[in-house]
């Protein structure tokens, strides 16, 4: 059963000593966003993030990082929400970054993908939660170098 939380996953890789971030275009509404999805049953946040990344891109990453960036989303957006009595109005969206080395093989949830530098990704992303998470990842990577 769908768990009452959402995960947002930003894969990144280094090309010519610069960070590139993977964003994908959703088939259902055409927006550019990070990889995302809901937890299932008793999955941990990290288990859900790894599963979503694999299901939607066939990627396996390393250096997983749970970010400080998170937001709350209206639960009415998600099927089965009437079972989530402990969350009467909203559910949390937890964000992750993950380092990858390969290109994705997209599931049918997406029509296209791009490896973007920070500025291009910020301009293409539709949702504030995605832009906030990407800002945090970019800051973490910049400060680590």
Language-model features, listed with the residues they occupy:
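Residue-level signal for short segments within beta-strands and strand-turn junctions
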Residues: 11-13, 25, 99-100
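A short coil-to-beta-strand element that immediately follows conserved catalytic motifs
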Residues: 60-72
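Short connector loops at helix/strand junctions that flank enzyme active sites
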Residues: 4, 34, 89-93
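Conserved Nudix-box catalytic region and its N-terminal flanking loop in Nudix hydrolases
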Residues: 18-62
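Active-site-adjacent beta-strand/loop module that shapes the phosphate/pyrophosphate-binding cleft
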Residues: 70-104
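Generic C-terminal helix-cap and adjacent flexible tail
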Residues: 139-145
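NUDIX/MutT-family hydrolases
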Residues: 93-135
């Amino acid at each position: 059963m769908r768990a009452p939380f959402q995960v947002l996953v930003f894969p990144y890789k280094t090309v010519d000593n610069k960070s590139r971030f993977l964003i994908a275009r959703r088939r259902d509404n055409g927006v550019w966003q990070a990889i995302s999805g809901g937890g299932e049953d008793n999955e941990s946040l990290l288990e859900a993030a790894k599963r979503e990344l694999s299901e939607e891109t066939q990627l396996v990453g390393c250096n997983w990082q749970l970010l400080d960036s998170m937001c709350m989303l209206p639960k009415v957006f998600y099927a089965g929400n009437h079972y989530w009595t402990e969350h009467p109005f909203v559910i949390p969206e937890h964000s992750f970054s993950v380092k990858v080395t390969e290109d994705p093989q997209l599931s049918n949830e997406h029509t296209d993908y791009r490896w973007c530098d920070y500025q291009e990704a910020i301009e293409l992303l539709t949702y504030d939660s995605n832009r906030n998470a990407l800002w945090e990842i970019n800051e973490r990577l910049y400060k680590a170098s």
